[in-house]
Amino acid sequence: MNNCATFSMPHSNATNHTTLSHPVCNNNANCFTRSELYAIWSETINTLKRTFKIKNVHAHMLEDDSGEIKDYIRANLSRFTVITGKCSKRKVCHHDKRIARTLHLEKNLVDEYACSVTHVYSAPKW
């Protein structure tokens, strides 16, 4: 069985979809991980670039100038799906509260990295 996740992203033409595959932990198909949100973020940027809506596409999720990307994700949340080995089509909109919380984190990149490293190693290791 394939342990990859595929993300279907909406385009201006509803019949076209872009997919992204990468390995993810599939122990709980109902859980929406931050890495899946980052993959949706990347695919959103690619979609915006293809439609020439390039304002602030360089922005990271935790930066202040990422509003256009966040707005696009919020507006199209009901159209996103995640496909994993355990779940053929998991709707992203069911995780709207988790996504909203993650998109509104009050951290910078250094704090986010320190938090991630501390979570894994119990103390920063850089």
From Swiss-Prot:
<comment type="similarity">
    <text>Belongs to the baculoviridae LEF-11 family.</text>
</comment>
<keyword id="KW-0805">Transcription regulation</keyword>
<dbReference type="GO" id="GO:0006355">
    <property type="term" value="P:regulation of DNA-templated transcription"/>
</dbReference>
<dbReference type="GO" id="GO:0019058">
    <property type="term" value="P:viral life cycle"/>
</dbReference>
<dbReference type="Pfam" id="PF06385">
    <property type="entry name" value="Baculo_LEF-11"/>
</dbReference>
<comment type="function">
    <text>Involved in late/very late gene activation.</text>
</comment>
<dbReference type="InterPro" id="IPR009429">
    <property type="entry name" value="Baculo_LEF-11"/>
</dbReference>
<protein>
    <recommendedName>
        <fullName>Late expression factor 11</fullName>
    </recommendedName>
</protein>
<keyword id="KW-0804">Transcription</keyword>
